[in-house]
Amino acid sequence: MRTDTDKLIIAGREFNSRLMVGTGKYADFQQMVKAIEVSGAEIITVAVRRVNISDRNKESLLDHIDTKKYTLLPNTAGCYTADDAIRTCRLAREAGLSDFVKLEVLGDEKTLFPDNEELLKAAKVLIKEGFTVLPYTTDDPIVCKKLEDIGCAAVMPLGAPIGSGLGIRNPYNIRIILDTVKVPVIVDAGVGTASDAAIAMELGCHGVLMNTGIAGAKDPIAMAEAMNLAVRAGRLAYRAGRIPKKLYATASSPVEGTIE
């Protein structure tokens, strides 16, 4: 099965890699750059709050990212209201980062769960202003459908709380979301190891976004490679079509020619 034609398409943009990665929590910029390279990711998300917009003379993580090679996805991490998230996206666009944004509006500091009411409010405004919005949301099919209906280019339900490494806690909801919306479904948050990423892709998700799963590993470079392979393997397995699960065995060897 050819994989070079199996591209991720978001708002008309084509990407070969279905893995998206963040830029935080690395030991240094050099480690970040190497991990991103090894991951094979083409979409890199950056927290607008971490980018030094006001003083370009100071070192910034953007100094270490080749924007001709990667697509930047500014995110609104740390925003707890729609107004704050909207302001942050406007700043990103004015600074020349991108109008292709990952929208986060958090509702709780302990769980970092999204505030879906504020998220929908912010998404409506940003879409009207011409932003391409990829919202981080709960694994609620109803909310995901509402986000699609107002014009979001994809939906990004969490697999588990941000940074928890708990994996895909509710695969059934993810399946329902996949059956409910037509835009790409990107699992965002909770992926802790390669098997988590593979499971997300085997469910039929169009991609996976992660940061802590790679940056927080004992060897981030090795984990970046593992996640790269896992996403590709999971996608290939999904397209290949797994065998159905059955309670009893089915012999894999032919019974013809057996000695009586």
UniProtKB/Swiss-Prot annotation:
| Residues where 1-deoxy-D-xylulose 5-phosphate binds | 163, 189-190, 211-212
Q: In which pathway does it act?
A: Cofactor biosynthesis; thiamine diphosphate biosynthesis
Reaction(s) catalysed (UniProt annotation):
[ThiS sulfur-carrier protein]-C-terminal-Gly-aminoethanethioate + 2-iminoacetate + 1-deoxy-D-xylulose 5-phosphate = [ThiS sulfur-carrier protein]-C-terminal Gly-Gly + 2-[(2R,5Z)-2-carboxy-4-methylthiazol-5(2H)-ylidene]ethyl phosphate + 2 H2O + H(+)
Identify the SUPFAM superfamilies for this entry. ThiG-like
Keyword Cytoplasm present in the record's keywords: the answer is yes
GO CC, alphabetical: cytoplasm
Molecular function terms from GO? thiazole synthase activity
> Please, which domain of life does this record's source organism belong to?
Bacteria
CDD domains named in the record: ThiG
List keywords of the entry alphabetically. Answer: Cytoplasm, Schiff base, Thiamine biosynthesis, Transferase
Q: Where in the cell is it found?
A: Cytoplasm
Q: Which GO terms describe its biological process?
A: thiamine diphosphate biosynthetic process
Active-site positions on this chain: 102
Transmembrane segment boundaries = none
Subunit (UniProt):
Homotetramer. Forms heterodimers with either ThiH or ThiS.
What role is this protein assigned? Catalyzes the rearrangement of 1-deoxy-D-xylulose 5-phosphate (DXP) to produce the thiazole phosphate moiety of thiamine. Sulfur is provided by the thiocarboxylate moiety of the carrier protein ThiS. In vitro, sulfur can be provided by H(2)S.
**Family, per the entry?**
Belongs to the ThiG family.
PANTHER family membership: THIAZOLE SYNTHASE (PTHR34266:SF2)
| Protein name (record) | Thiazole synthase
What organism does the record attribute this protein to? Geotalea uraniireducens (strain Rf4)
Gene name on record?
thiG
